[in-house]
């Protein structure tokens, strides 16, 4: 069942979608059935987009909207995760919103980031905060989802595309996505270099699998803020532009057109 407004008609928060009432078991099973059709055709992962808000004037079967608002993402992702695991054997979704408990239903990505240096820096900060909140796996749109002011016709600068690809290589999951073409052949000047970084990514797959297993066992994220390894170092509590990728790689992305790291207080004595 779709949720309904106070007059009993189907309530849609968006022009192109209804919002499913996951507090109602029949609605949840109906949704799982739709996903099962896709999974039976060979789909291996469902993107649970949106889910970060609900409308307070809608009626839900099992909960008041003011209590459901944050919980909705958890119920939404749980349903998709469960049916995916039942059909494919692999427990995975590609989720945007999250609340406490959603770490049980990986993975999540950072949403619609701006294709700029600031957007890249903000994505990394968000990912590190996400890891500190208990989420082991996290991704982001490479090389950002949109530009400004041309939101829907975003052409990314080559240097941003290249540096964001490098950031993506050292992330738990990598995906190219945006409001315009993101395939590397649309960026011919840098496509050969992108290919080299992809080869490195595939070389790292055994390491990523090993670190992922450790993350599942321990709860530690793959992208680890420096304080994971250096909690006694006060400076590390303020560094949000580099991270450990698993236990063995210290990653410091370049996030400017000058192709350099710029921190006068760069701290490497104990790293």
Residue ranges and their predicted role:
Residues 1-264, 269:
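Catalytic-domain carbohydrate-binding cleft regions of carbohydrate-active enzymes
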């Amino acid at each position: 069942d779709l949720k309904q407004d106070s007059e009993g008609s189907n309530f849609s928060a968006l022009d192109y979608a209804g919002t499913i009432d996951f507090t109602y078991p029949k609605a949840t099973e109906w949704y799982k059935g739709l996903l099962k059709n896709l999974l039976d055709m060979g789909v291996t992962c469902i993107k649970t987009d949106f889910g970060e808000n609900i409308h307070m004037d809608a009626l839900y079967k099992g909960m008041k909207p003011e209590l459901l608002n944050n919980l909705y993402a958890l119920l939404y992702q749980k349903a998709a995760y469960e049916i995916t695991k039942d059909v494919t054997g692999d427990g995975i979704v590609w989720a945007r919103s999250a609340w406490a408990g959603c770490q049980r239903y990986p993975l999540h990505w950072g949403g619609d980031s701006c294709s700029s240096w600031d957007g890249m820096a903000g994505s990394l900060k968000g990912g590190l905060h996400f890891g500190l909140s208990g989420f082991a796996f996290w991704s982001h749109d490479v090389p950002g989802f949109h530009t400004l002011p041309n939101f829907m016709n975003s052409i990314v600068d080559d240097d941003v595309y290249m540096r964001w690809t490098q950031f993506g290589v050292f992330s738990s999951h990598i995906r190219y996505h945006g409001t315009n073409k993101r395939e590397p052949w649309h960026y011919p000047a840098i496509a050969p270099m992108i290919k080299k970084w992809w080869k490195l990514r595939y070389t790292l797959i055994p390491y990523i699998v090993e670190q992922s297993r450790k993350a599942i066992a321990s709860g530690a994220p793959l992208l680890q803020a420096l304080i994971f390894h250096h909690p006694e170092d006060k400076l590390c509590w303020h560094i949000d532009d580099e991270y450990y990728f698993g236990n063995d790689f210290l990653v410091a992305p370049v996030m400017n057109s000058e192709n350099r790291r710029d921190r006068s207080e760069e701290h490497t004595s104990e790293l």
